[in-house]
Amino acid sequence: LREYTTLALETNRRHFFLGSLLAGAVPAAGFGSTPSLKLAGYKSPNEKLNIASIGAGGKASSDIAACAPTENIVALCDVDDRQAAATYKRFESVPKYKDFRRMLDKEDKNIDAVIVCTPDHMHGMQAMWCMERGKHVYVQKPLTRTVWEARQLLEAARKYKVATQMGNQGYSNEGTRQVAEMIWAGEIGEVREVHAWTDRPIWPQGLTSIPPEEPVPDTLDWDLWLGIADMRPFTSGKDTGKYPNRFGGYFYQPFNWRGFYDFGCGALGDMACHILGAPNMALQLGPPKSVECIKKEGTSPFMFPERSVIRFEFPARGNMPPVTLYWYDGCKETPRIEGVPEGEWLGDMPFLMGGGQGQQGGPPRQAQRTGYVGRLFDWEQYEAMRKEPDKLRFPPPDGALFVGSKGMITTGTYGEQTRLIPAEKMKDYRFPAPLLTRSPGHYRDWIRACKGGEPACSNFEVAAPFTEWMLLGVIALRVEGKLEYDPVKMRFTNNNEANKYLKPTFRKGWSFA
């Protein structure tokens, strides 16, 4: 347990089964087992990193902004000048590229680390090219689009000894650690069932036709955007009125790609790395025995469905019993779960209208940046909200529920606002003594690792196995029936069609390494 800091470890009922639980298990879903980087010749904590970014618009802009206050941004790459315009203006003097391969070649000596924030289908190749050149990488979630790519990146991180982090910010949050420590302390007994839900997709899914071909905008390099994926005509879809995009843009990009089999991983790929972060850490989840999509609506030959329910069956892990995890997406409201008291708030908390952004459900926008470690449950705020129901604003339904033999715990989207159910149990509740190292914030965690510090909390030793089991659910959306998985052979034992989706195909002229 070298990677963990034990503070005031109590030898009371809170940790009655902790020793046997943690023996050999915690690093699997905590901070990983990568050796310290201090002797690897990396920059000292007082030196600034030279960071490049593959992707400059959209989510990449906030990743870059989170690193810019303390580090140097030295190169930017984006295939879409329109999407990247605001970031390019902010960093006017920084070299700009459209092809990430050219950027890595031209700027090799100037770059220490790279942010990879592009559509899912390009994560694997881009991260691999960076690591092969000795660059530390911060890769947005999901780590990859396929299981094979996730395993390749894990092996590369070990081989090239670079600092890594997946962009599932909730893994750094205080609440994620709180729920792990509560469960390890036996607060709700044995956990054999977990439910997790999201309102995503907030982009089109389940479409059944593709609009006619249109000219490619001058600002977009369509060939580079497609990357490893098969060539297809560009279309905006704007004139049909059938393809809504809440964030502007075109039929495939810059945002709708998440819903397509060839480019994204649907709602599960978008949000599971956040919402299921707390279950992954607390329950030490590894490969499931089986996965099955047990319900789906609005299906398509080339897109993920509009709504789905997926069931994962995990075997026993050490002294932890088998657990069944249910994933719901396309939710308009929180699923009704047996045993939850009527009117109980699950997942993300509401907040008081006019109460400012510091309320339970409304964090400041800047809080998502460098040192943010999440919103915590506050009993006084909870009481105040219960007294003024007419002034409450409810966020979209997102969250998770742990069902134990002695009680329940719920968490929000990013492992925040951890609390027992019913929440009245929190009035005089004292959390267990901290066992896990606290994060300085997801970006600082990675930057520290790049400078020789301890491995980041969602380094690829953690992120790759997490991504792998999540991606099995993505495959289950495309194949009917229960899929039985052999992690040693990396294959489904009862469905050859499903095995086709474990590894990507590469368009001619594109190579993974």
Region locations from a protein language model:
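Conserved acidic residues
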Residues: 74, 112, 192
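Short, solvent-exposed turn/loop segments enriched in Gly/Ser/Thr/Pro and often Arg
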Residues: 80, 117-122, 143-145, 150, ...
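N-terminal Rossmann-like dinucleotide-binding module
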Residues: 23-91, 170-173, 183, 279
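N-terminal secretory signal peptides and thylakoid transit peptides that target proteins
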Residues: 4-24
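Contiguous beta-strand/loop segments that form the cofactor/metal-binding neighborhood of enzyme cores
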Residues: 178, 190, 195-461, 467-513
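A structured beta-alpha segment of the ubiquitous adenosine-cofactor-binding alpha/beta core
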Residues: 95-111, 116
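Beta-strand-loop-alpha-helix segment that lines the small-molecule cofactor/substrate pocket
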Residues: 119-120, 124-172, 186
